[in-house]
Regions:
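N-terminal first-folded block
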Residues: 1-27, 38
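C-terminal structural segments of small proteins and small subunits
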Residues: 50-75
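A short, structured beta-strand/loop element
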Residues: 23-59
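A ubiquitous, low-specificity "background" feature that marks scattered single residues
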Residues: 14-16, 42, 65
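Residue-level preference for alpha-helix termini and adjacent loops
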Residues: 3-6, 45, 51, 73
Length: 75
């Protein structure tokens, strides 16, 4: 498995928006994204950090049920 890269928050948010996530709100230094699926609503919180730590991005990908390869295609 490849290492999760350290990316800026704006690139990550744009990638998730391409995947169908919608920005619901921005509060303080965090952005909240939602995506409705037939089974559930996936909710993500992205910190507005440049760059986002690799471990944080790894947890965000797990919450979104997305692989690193899928994220690379969306970037």
């Amino acid at each position: 498995m490849n290492k999760v890269p350290s990316l800026d928050y704006d690139k990550v948010v744009r990638a998730f928006q391409r995947d169908g996530f919608v920005v619901v709100r921005t509060r303080g230094s965090h952005i909240r994204l939602h995506k409705n699926t037939p089974e559930e609503t996936i909710k993500l919180t992205i910190p507005m950090h440049k760059p986002i730590k690799r471990s944080t991005l790894s947890h965000i990908l797990k919450q979104a049920d997305m692989t690193l390869e899928e994220l690379d295609k969306l970037l």
